[in-house]
Amino acid sequence: MTSDFKVIIVGGSVAGLSLAHCLEKIGVSFVVLEKGNQIAPQLGASIGILPNGGRILDQLGIFHSIEDEIEPLESAMMRYPDGFSFKSQYPQALHTSFGYPVAFLERQRFLQILYDKLKSKDCVFTNKRVVSIASGQDKVTAKTSDGAKYLADIVIGADGVHSIVRSEIWRHLKENSQISVLEAPNASIKHDYSCIYGISLNVPQIILGIQLNCLDDGVSIHLFTGKQSKLFWFVIIKTPQASFAKVEIDNTHTARCICEGLRTKKVSDTLCFEDVWSRCTIFKMTPLEEGVFKHWNYGRLACIGDAIRKMAPNNGQGANMAIEDACSLANILQKKISHGSIRDQDINSMFQEFSMAQRARTESVCAQSEFLVRMHANQGIGRRLLGRYLIPFLYDAPAGLSGFSISGATRIEFIDLPTRSLRGAWGKSWRGSWEFILQSLVYLRPKFRIVYALYLVAAAAFILYCLSSLFP
């Protein structure tokens, strides 16, 4: 390592390992403290890598290993309660526009790749639960449950929604009267849905490269094909507030009861959820938190990933935004180091710069996620009408929504862009839906063009009205 600056990363999952890779590239010393006994445990979860995450991983020299593990998505089928369905080419549209496929693979395998590609494996420690963090005048110390102490210049919390680093940030803010003692850390977090996720094998009637979605009342089912006859799936279900404690305490029994009740749900014309559930090899249930935490840093402490935001998996951006966080923080750190050693007074400004760089984008992507999970579950008359009667006739509206969130993505500024990303629509306005509308008008018979155009204008106006809050 070429820098005297040292970073403690609390948490060895997507955000933590991504940051470790970025720090390795700029020569900054680090340690990763993971509380679990494995870096890549098998929890039955899958992970979606969209072009914004894929581009960063490609810059880090990792994406080719991920591509070897995936069955790229090409299209998606959306099915509604009345049996109506439509096909979206959003995965292929995103691949064509940004240069990277929509990739789904086992979360365990993804984490293993991140770890295997890391050169400084001796800096990654498991069974290291951080129990306290003490800030000194010029250093910070993290103490783990086994009594070990680690000294560094800053501590980055990549330790998820129940982050001890974020708890320490809130404690300091309250002690220094920067926030009210009555202000709750989770005040901005919603708990409206739960997620059951799992992996099934050898499910019949599955076509590789096609994502299947059942968008029912209060529940949505999503299926993604993988290699080796694996099918990754998750069920998002509206959950009463009083039931969340039960979900956390006895999630296996609760999940089993819910899935048993969904057996007859048709995911396609030829496939019922029974076909998926009966071939399930592993599953788990978890409450879904949604929202952006208000405070991200204090002193020498800062958070990234799920420690600063939580979103439903419907837009597939959770892991990708965590990767972007790591990239954004590394960009700022690299600039500081390139101008000489980092002074104590530079640390707070560095974290403030990170917050300014990521907060607006974070809030926008989270708003999109909140909108999607509710539209997929047909919650509210406006979302129900939008999903069932308008979006299907705009052809690639799903691609447009995804394209909006991808086009403004962060990239590693100190590493050249890969060739495949140079042809992409990065940083440009996403006009896929509107281009299709203009093209479709050309091929319609003249007497239908006016009717179709008026319908699309009305549909577009309604969509813009519904989505206006999502794209500030």
Curated annotation (Swiss-Prot):
The alphabetized UniProt keywords are: FAD, Flavoprotein, Glycoprotein, Membrane, Monooxygenase, Oxidoreductase, Transmembrane, Transmembrane helix
Q: Where mainly found? A: membrane
Where does the protein end up? Answer: Membrane
* Pathway the protein acts in: Secondary metabolite biosynthesis
What residue ranges are annotated as transmembrane? Answer: 7-27, 450-470
Q: Name one GO cellular component term.
A: membrane
Q: EC number(s) for this protein?
A: 1.-.-.-
Give this protein's Gene Ontology molecular function annotations.
FAD binding; monooxygenase activity
Which membrane topology describes this protein?
A: Multi-pass membrane protein
Is this entry keyworded Transmembrane helix?
A: yes
Q: Cite the InterPro entries for this sequence.
A: FAD-bd, FAD/NAD-bd_sf, FAD_mOase_fung
Does the keyword field hold 4Fe-4S?
no
What PANTHER family does the record tag this protein with? FAD-BINDING DOMAIN-CONTAINING PROTEIN-RELATED, FAD-DEPENDENT MONOOXYGENASE ASQG-RELATED
The UniProt function text for this chain reads: FAD-dependent monooxygenase; part of the gene cluster that mediates the biosynthesis of lolitrems, indole-diterpene mycotoxins that are potent tremorgens in mammals, and are synthesized by clavicipitaceous fungal endophytes in association with their grass hosts. The geranylgeranyl diphosphate (GGPP) synthase ltmG is proposed to catalyze the first step in lolitrem biosynthesis. LtmG catalyzes a series of iterative condensations of isopentenyl diphosphate (IPP) with dimethylallyl diphosphate (DMAPP), geranyl diphosphate (GPP), and farnesyl diphosphate (FPP), to form GGPP.
Q: What is this protein called?
A: FAD-dependent monooxygenase ltmM
Where is the organism placed in the taxonomic lineage, from the top? Eukaryota, Fungi, Dikarya, Ascomycota, Pezizomycotina
Q: Which gene encodes it?
A: ltmM
